[in-house]
Amino acid sequence: MKYRDLRDFISKLEADGELRRVDVEVDPRLEMTEVCDRTLRAEGPAILFQKPKGYRMPVLGNLFGTPRRVALGMGAEDVSALREIGELLAFLRQPEPPKGLRDAWSQLPVFRKVLDMGPKKVRRAACQEVVVEGDDVDLGRLPVQTCWPGDAGPLITWALVVTRGPEKERQNLGIYRNQVIGRNRTIMRWLAHRGGALDFRDWQRERPGEPFPVAIALGADPATILGAVTPVPDSLSEYGFAGLLRGSKTELVKCLGPDLQVPASAEIVLEGHIHPDDTAPEGPFGDHTGYYNEVDHFPVFTVDRITHRRDPIYHSTYTGRPPDEPAILGVALNEVFVPILRKQFPEISDFYLPPEGCSYRMAVVTMKKQYPGHAKRVMLGVWSFLRQFMYTKFVIVTDDDVNARDWKDVIWAMTTRMDPKRDTVMIDNTPIDYLDFASPVSGLGSKIGFDATHKWPGETDREWGRPIVMDDETRARVDALWPKLGLD
């Protein structure tokens, strides 16, 4: 099923029993986090808080709190169907030349579908039904959550940030948290390698001293939100990918101020600018690591205008020790990653990002090993192939007789197939998540790979062990005998 906007998705979830409305007063300060955290850990529904304490605007929480709801948001019925989305993205990243005329004709519908999904510009939009400008702008009217007791203040978490570098036609969409520090000011926390930060850097180089236009969409349709966190190939915009997921073009409307296009169906849009010289200390905030992050300086976003729908809904979340919503998103998007990796490395059988590893800090890869040193090639490939794995600190590679998603299997392989000196690869001075306080330098640290595969001649001089497996005849006899044993 496809969803026109966030409200359409809410209606679908409610009809399926996947969303509950809460009419009891709940405080956006701390209480909503505790309610959502307990609900997520119980694999419970999305929550629409209809009476946030001190506010008239309802708050939507725990929207992507189960892998199935992530799949539904991407237009699929279950998580397994996300492999098809990954296969499409893998094809678009590296389309193979047609093998003949018939093959060329068979590929034509795919390219036509992609070309037809460019965004559609509209003049009027629901997100601009109400306009608030100048001195009337007050972020304090939004029920922004303060998530944890040690947080520096309210934090906008599902901010879909829209930017464009100088002389660029294509806009960048990224989700960057924003700390509210005043009536019309937030701190934009984007890391140096992210698209928004790169656009800002280019702007400063080309137009020094000039304010950088920025817009933030809150409460976009699920396809647009999820398109911003999916590994979309450079040849396809996030808006175009959202159109593919939705099955219809993403409708965009020009901001009333900056020359930027925002999702027409968004609940709320913040329009404004960042001045190159305006920064402020951001944090601390409880993060997906389970710890409070360090305080660091980031640009200040000044909000010049707020536009929104009539009776808008504020979409929010929290981050904390896994499982949290980012971890659940990681579990679902894992299925998108697998076909993309297999396209580049056909020997890969499965790929798994354990949610306990903060969504991306550890990866387990199973493969069909074909030659000595093969596992090391694969682990180096994982680190370098997709931007999403730039911060993956630990990569475990093992044979395809191991279940990558079963820790008992993985630990067995590591403890029986590895020599710590021979089978580890350590790389120093690599990019590391700024939130990773374990690294010796902020943003720079090491990575380690574990080769837990069977060793081939050339990797060892010893006779390799043979796994213990019961023969099929005995298993069949015991299967027939089992009901008579009274052991169930």
Swiss-Prot record:
Give the pathway annotation: Cofactor biosynthesis; ubiquinone biosynthesis
Entry keyword set: Cell membrane, Decarboxylase, Flavoprotein, FMN, Lyase, Manganese, Membrane, Metal-binding, Ubiquinone biosynthesis
- What is the source species? Alkalilimnicola ehrlichii (strain ATCC BAA-1101 / DSM 17681 / MLHE-1)
Instruction: Name the reaction it catalyses.
Output: a 4-hydroxy-3-(all-trans-polyprenyl)benzoate + H(+) = a 2-(all-trans-polyprenyl)phenol + CO2
The active site consists of: 287
InterPro entries named among the record's database cross-references? UbiD (IPR002830), UbiD-like_C (IPR049381), UbiD-like_N (IPR049383), UbiD_bacteria (IPR023677), UbiD_Rift_dom (IPR048304)
Q: Which domain of life is it from?
A: Bacteria
Residue ranges that the Swiss-Prot or TrEMBL entry lists as coiled coil:
none
How does this protein assemble? Homohexamer.
Where is Mn(2+) bound in this sequence?
172, 238
Q: Which family does it belong to?
A: Belongs to the UbiD family.
**Topological category with respect to the lipid bilayer:** Peripheral membrane protein
Needed co-factor(s): prenylated FMN; Mn(2+)
Q: Primary place of residence?
A: membrane
Q: Name one GO cellular component term.
A: plasma membrane
Purpose: Catalyzes the decarboxylation of 3-octaprenyl-4-hydroxy benzoate to 2-octaprenylphenol, an intermediate step in ubiquinone biosynthesis.
Q: Under which name does UniProt file this protein?
A: 3-octaprenyl-4-hydroxybenzoate carboxy-lyase
What gene name does this entry carry?
A: ubiD
